[in-house]
Structures are given as structure tokens and as C-alpha cells.
Amino acid sequence: MKKLIALLLVLATLLGGCGGAAEPATEATTEATTEPTTEPTTEPTTEPAPTYVNPLNGEISEIPYTGRVFATTISNVPAALPHVNAKEADIIMEMFVNSSVVRCIGLFHDISKVDAIGSTRSTRPMFNDIAEHYDAVLSHAGGTNTALVNANEHGITHYNVDSLYRKVDDPLKAGTAYRDKEYKHGEHNLFLSGPGIVAYAQSEGIQTTDLPERDYGLIFAEDGTPINSEAADTIVLQMKYKSTKKETVMEYDAEAGTYTWWQYGEMMADQITEEPETFENVVMMFVPMTTMKHGYHVADFLPGGTGYYACNGRLTPITWTCAGDKEPFRFFTAEGDPLPFGAGKTYIAISSPEGTVEWTAKEPEVPETTEATVPETTAATVPETAETTAP
């Protein structure tokens, strides 16, 4: 019996040792893993390069125009045609200058790129006026004492290249112009050198670059089609002064978006390149005109006036103003809003108020109609139905 009790005590002891003390419960701790936050990175934005508009032709440029406008006289009588590089002018203005003589003045924003221009003729008071309005350096082939005194009185910078080119011992003077006697005879064979006249002007102390930006009166739009306009594929501009008249015709080329210049029954094409003379913008300005005692016509631009404007095959009546002797022409719609021109070259006819403008639209092309052929119909063949016999 004692042995049994002892055995039970041993077993109890062993069982208690196997259980041992209960370990304290440990709560599982989960460390929050924080994802590293990345700051949003913004790509550096590049400011678009500023764009500028050429004030004479509306072309877009990355730099402003700070040059000097140059102007030159261009003969426009039949004996002087065809022109040489008149098509390179940003603006061509045509007018009667005395009696029945019609001439042009061309305005160039960078005449240094044009090797030859002409033929060039003598200046007139109206050319002097226009050069003053645009602060242009005027080149011409002499002029009467009255015209030259008038140019000096206007304070314009002007050069008589007919005199300068003869100074063969002075390369700068001699390089301003040249005569091409194979081209034309007499007074119609003097041609201005664009690079030559710029170099000579610079040698005379005339600043031709890095000038303050200037307002030349024109505004431009990507699409210069005038509002409240009529279709005008053919425009006949008739300049008149008293009993004298001269007709210019502009034919619209819809594919090119330009008007081609016709006069004296011929299309105007360049003597050297044979390319037609074309314009994106066509303008008629009606201006009060009088005649000085020596026979020169003068225009009174300061009151402003009316006219017409055409672009992209459409034409509309306009008004225009000129605020002073040194102010450019400004153009407006008939309602008085600023008139945007289309980017490109501009032709301006200057006429007394007796001048006229007529225009016509092309007849729309009617597509040829072909007789519809009715296809022959064949009668459908009804298949024979197989007789079914009852089994």
C-alpha cells in the first residue's frame, strides 16, 4: 500500500513538471510599413518663343522688325515694261504723277535682298509725300528742281542714284545703281541695286537696323477675307484724273489665293524670272488731287477718304485715314472697324474720286450631266416545283 502511494506521488510530480508555468500571452504587434511618398515632379515648362508680325506684309517672325523701310520709284509706262523685281516690294502704289504719266512707288522692308529693281525714274511730290508718311529712304533717278526742293522741304532721306552711279571712282556711290542698255533704251534702263543703296545709306550715317519699332498702320489676319463682301474674281480699277484715265485689272487665282496684275492688255510678268506679279491684297484709294503750276499732281491725304479692298476673291467698300504728314495710311471697314489685311503683298491704286472700281464673279462651273442608263431587267425564272407523290 505504501509503495502504491509513493508511486502516485512520483507520477503527480512528473506531470506537474511537464506542464510547467504558463508563458504570458504576447500580442502580435504589426509595424505599419509606410510607403515612401514621392513628391510629384512637374516638367519644366518652356515658354513659347514670342512671335512678331512684319508690319508691311504680315509675315510671322521670331524677332521684331527694327529695320528701315526703303522706297524706290518704278516706271509703269508701256515702254518701261516688263518690270524688274517690282514683285519683291511689300507694297506697290500706283498713281498719276503728272499729266498722263503713271508711275509706281515700291516699299521694301529689306531692300538689301533685292539685287535689281526698276526701271527707276525721277521723283515727284506724291512720292515724297508717301516716303514721309512711312519714314522711308527714297531712291530715284533725279527730278526737277521743284521736286527735289519739295523732297528736302519734307525732310525725307532721298538719293538721286542717276547721279551717284556715275561716280565710278567711288565704289559705294557707283554701286547704288546701273544701266542695262540691252534691256531698254533711253530713260528706261536705270536699275537700283538694293544692297548698293543700303550700303551707301549706311556710309552716310543712316541707321538701317536696330531702330525702335514703328507703327506702319496695317494690321493683318491669318485670313484676310473681308466681311460683308461680294465675290470679285475680276476687278477693274480705273484711275482717273480730269480727262486722263488708266485701267488696271486684277484676276483672282483661287488655287494660289492671289490676284494677278494685268495692264495694257498684258499680264505683268517679271523681266528676269518671268513669274507673274501677284498680290494677296488689292486696294483702291480715292484721294482729292490737284495740279501744281509746273504740272505735277499732288494728293491731299490728310482728310482721308473712301475706297475698296479685296482679298481671297472677295471685295468690300472701305474708308481710310491719314492723321498727319508723318503718319501712315490706316484702313477701316465701311462700319468703321479696323480692317485686317491678309498676310502677303499689297497693291494700292491711288485715284481721284472720279475713279471707278468694277468687279465680277466667275460663273460657277456646272458639272456635265450624263444620261442615266437604266439597267435591263431580266425576268426571274421561277423554278419548277417537283411534284411530290404520296407514298
Model-derived features: where do they sit?
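Hydrophobic alpha-helical segments, principally membrane-spanning helices and signal/leader peptides
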Residues: 1-2, 297, 377
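Positively charged n-region of N-terminal signal peptides that target proteins for export
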Residues: 1-9
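Bacterial lipoprotein signal-peptidase II cleavage site
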Residues: 18-27
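Ser/Thr/Gly/Pro-rich low-complexity, disordered linker/stalk segments of secreted
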Residues: 29-47, 365-391
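A surface/extracellular/periplasmic glyco- and lipid-processing/surface-interacting theme
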Residues: 47-93, 98-367
